[in-house]
């Protein structure tokens, strides 16, 4: 499974289960031949591969106000603190993967965020390898890129 898709589904599942904190870390070797997911200490969420993509995605969610924060733990895992309204409903209503490993979607800056009128964000991958949201792309006059996901 694609790393970003795995992170998106883990965040969705954690919000449905009303979890406050998620922990993500790299694969741990169980045997000489196999790599498997190792459950976290609380045994609620599987740990997924932490890459620069995950860090950039969490940075964008934090800057846009969708999560309270994220940090690196002593063991190298990624800790994400989810955000909820006072009624207990998660701030993130919907997360949708747009570009998939088998079907890539690209867009120019002119076609970004016109139909949503500022509701939610679209996350793009740049040619330099980092992630930016559609608002940053409009401000910096970025030409366009691969549309990874949308968050509402």
From Swiss-Prot:
The keyword Ribosomal protein applies. The keyword Iron does not apply. It is found in: Mitochondrion. InterPro entries: Ribosomal_uS8, Ribosomal_uS8_sf. Keywords: Mitochondrion, Ribonucleoprotein, Ribosomal protein. Pfam families: Ribosomal_S8. GO terms for biological process: translation. SUPFAM superfamilies: Ribosomal protein S8. One of its GO terms (molecular function) is structural constituent of ribosome. GO terms for cellular component: mitochondrion; ribonucleoprotein complex; ribosome. Its main location: mitochondrion. It comes from the Eukaryota. Belongs to the universal ribosomal protein uS8 family. This is Small ribosomal subunit protein uS8m. It comes from Marchantia polymorpha (Common liverwort).
């Amino acid at each position: 499974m694609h790393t970003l898709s795995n992170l998106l589904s883990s965040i969705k599942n954690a919000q449905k289960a009303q979890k406050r904190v998620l922990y993500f870390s790299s694969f741990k070797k169980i045997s000489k031949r196999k790599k498997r997911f190792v459950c976290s200490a609380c045994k609620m969420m599987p740990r997924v591969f932490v890459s620069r993509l995950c860090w950039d995605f969490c940075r964008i969610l934090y800057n846009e106000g969708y999560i309270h924060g994220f940090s690196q733990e002593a063991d190298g895992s990624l800790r994400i603190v989810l955000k909820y309204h006072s009624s207990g409903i998660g701030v993130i209503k919907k997360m949708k993967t747009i570009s998939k490993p088998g079907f890539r979607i690209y867009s120019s800056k002119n076609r970004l965020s016109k139909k949503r009128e500022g509701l939610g964000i679209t996350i793009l991958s740049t040619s330099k390898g980092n992630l930016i949201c559609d608002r940053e792309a409009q401000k910096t006059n970025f030409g366009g890129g691969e549309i990874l996901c949308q968050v509402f």
